[in-house]
């Protein structure tokens, strides 16, 4: 006789990752309860945890594919309809007093990433959950404790305006809990009381502050809406992403010491922008608005988190930033979190967690095996995108201007376009336009680098050999051979340092 596959699933966190997890569990017949510390995220008065009103997200293939597997086509259509395609980077600079901009396409096949508004995405997911009968949403509930051996959790209801004495704590039983409550995760904190978790947290010496480029007086974009705009500056950078209201959401990334200098004097701020980010002020943001936004908007740190395992027994698994907060420089934080959900439920399906013909006891054992398999697979990928995101910061703030970066990109894109059978792709294309595991991306890119390096050195050696033969025939030209040998050694050193 077939057993019921219904499980009680508690999800902590109603952001995009937690909401997608709820849709996946609900689609499999589970009874789902979602608990969120903040008020209803669809309410404009709800204050985000980072105290910023709007953060644009880069939504790419991994995130879209994960949402696609929820089988909610109308929801996905709504999100993408309001998103803005970004076909590449637009690099800004100034030479000899003249402003310039140079476009760098993301992909030779015309693929693009999407600038999506966080609230639009989150609202669409929450609206879908509210229409789902086996899902219940609980806002203003803080996770205060959990017993992951007894499968119990405690939440404190915190209604704004209530005194602490009026707060009520409730107990919730569950079959398993998904922690999707961000970098400062309470789920992870309580899981670490039961699992032996290796945990690494790092704050890099970079702060970020949000700015806004308004639309023109005619209500249009001031700069190209189909690019991610970058003003690179070695130690810092300024970026701008398009928004649906024809404005741009901008971010200044800089060391804490640089922020301190900017805060010391309004003139320092204006001079710094003129020197390092030419064309931003006054062309796109007035000096008054620039100063006001810098003083009003918070200057926030960037956190990077690695941990393992991502689960305990059959009762809890953490996903998204709770498991692997990454720096924002690859635009993969959201995409990796949404991909977590697809991978997790695919593994649970593979292990028969939702098989109607097994007993509750066997279902628990299957879930335990699935969570272990998820940890074993996902840790390598989570650590990989963490490392890639750190590396991409250097590329964005300086590497995009280097000739060697452009050379390698050109070679790899040429091979991708004209010899597709080789399976050659740039690192960016593999990360943003495929569902290849992040850990496999690193291996593939390293392999390509070695092959390019071998071809590069071979070309130099061939040239040296030709000149050597000529020099042997004409001894008076032997000095040419010496020069070429020296040049070959130097180029080889450059290649190894840049492309290894």
From Swiss-Prot:
Keywords: FAD, Flavoprotein, Membrane, Mitochondrion, Mitochondrion outer membrane, Monooxygenase, NADP, Oxidoreductase, Pyridine nucleotide biosynthesis. Its main location: mitochondrion. Pathway: Cofactor biosynthesis; NAD(+) biosynthesis; quinolinate from L-kynurenine: step 1/3. Its cofactor is FAD. It catalyses: L-kynurenine + NADPH + O2 + H(+) = 3-hydroxy-L-kynurenine + NADP(+) + H2O. GO terms for biological process: 'de novo' NAD biosynthetic process from L-tryptophan; anthranilate metabolic process; kynurenine metabolic process; L-tryptophan catabolic process; quinolinate biosynthetic process. Pfam families: FAD_binding_3. HAMAP family: Kynurenine_monooxygenase (MF_01971). This is Kynurenine 3-monooxygenase. It comes from Aspergillus terreus (strain NIH 2624 / FGSC A1156).
């Amino acid at each position: 006789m077939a057993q019921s596959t219904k499980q009680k699933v508690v999800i902590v966190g109603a952001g995009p990752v937690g909401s997608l997890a709820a849709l996946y569990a609900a689609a499999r017949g589970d009874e789902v309860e979602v608990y969120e510390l903040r008020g209803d995220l669809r309410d404009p008065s709800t204050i985000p945890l980072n105290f910023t009103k709007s953060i644009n997200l880069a939504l790419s293939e991994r995130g879209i594919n994960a949402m696609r597997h929820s089988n909610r086509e109308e929801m996905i259509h709504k999100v993408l309809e309001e998103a803005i395609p970004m076909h590449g980077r637009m690099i800004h600079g100034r030479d000899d007093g003249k402003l310039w901009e140079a476009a760098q396409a993301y992909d030779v096949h015309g693929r693009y990433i999407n600038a999506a508004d966080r609230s639009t995405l989150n609202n669409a997911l929450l609206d879908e959950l509210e229409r789902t009968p086996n899902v219940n949403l609980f806002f203003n509930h803080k996770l205060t404790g959990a017993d992951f051996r007894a499968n119990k959790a405690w939440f404190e209801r915190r209604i704004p305006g209530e005194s602490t004495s009026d707060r009520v704590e409730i107990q919730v039983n569950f079959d398993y809990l998904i922690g999707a409550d961000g970098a400062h995760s309470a789920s992870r904190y309580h899981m670490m009381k039961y699992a032996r978790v290796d945990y690494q947290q790092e704050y890099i010496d970079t702060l970020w502050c949000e700015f806004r480029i308004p639309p023109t007086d005619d209500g249009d974009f001031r700069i190209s809406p189909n690019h991610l705009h970058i003003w690179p500056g070695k130690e810092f950078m300024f970026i701008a992403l398009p928004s649906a209201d024809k404005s741009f959401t901008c971010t200044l990334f800089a060391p804490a010491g640089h922020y301190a200098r900017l805060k010391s004097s309004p003139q320092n701020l204006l001079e710094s922008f003129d020197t390092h980010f030419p064309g931003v002020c006054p062309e796109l943001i007035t000096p008054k608005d620039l100063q006001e936004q810098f003083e009003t908007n918070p200057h926030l740190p960037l956190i990077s988190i690695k941990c393992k395992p991502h689960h305990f027994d059959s009762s809890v698994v953490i996903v998204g930033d709770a498991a692997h907060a990454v720096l924002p420089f690859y635009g993969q934080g959201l995409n990796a979190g949404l991909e977590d959900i697809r991978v997790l439920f695919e593994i649970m399906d593979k292990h028969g967690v939702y098989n109607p013909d097994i007993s509750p006891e066997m279902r628990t054992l299957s879930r335990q095996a699935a969570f272990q398999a998820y940890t074993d697979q996902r840790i390598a990928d989570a650590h990989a995108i963490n490392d890639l995101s750190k590396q991409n910061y250097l590329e964005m703030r300086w590497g995009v201007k280097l000739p060697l970066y452009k050379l390698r990109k050109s070679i790899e894109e040429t091979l991708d376009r004209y010899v597709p059978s080789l399976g050659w792709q740039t690192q960016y294309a593999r990360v943003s336009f495929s569902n290849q595991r992040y850990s496999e991306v690193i291996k593939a890119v390293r392999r390509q680098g070695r092959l390019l390096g071998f071809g590069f050195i071979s070309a130099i050696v061939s040239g040296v050999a030709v000149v050597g033969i000529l020099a042997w025939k004409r001894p008076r030209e032997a000095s040419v051979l010496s020069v070429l040998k020296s040049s070959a050694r130097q180029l080889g050193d450059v290649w190894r340092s840049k492309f290894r």
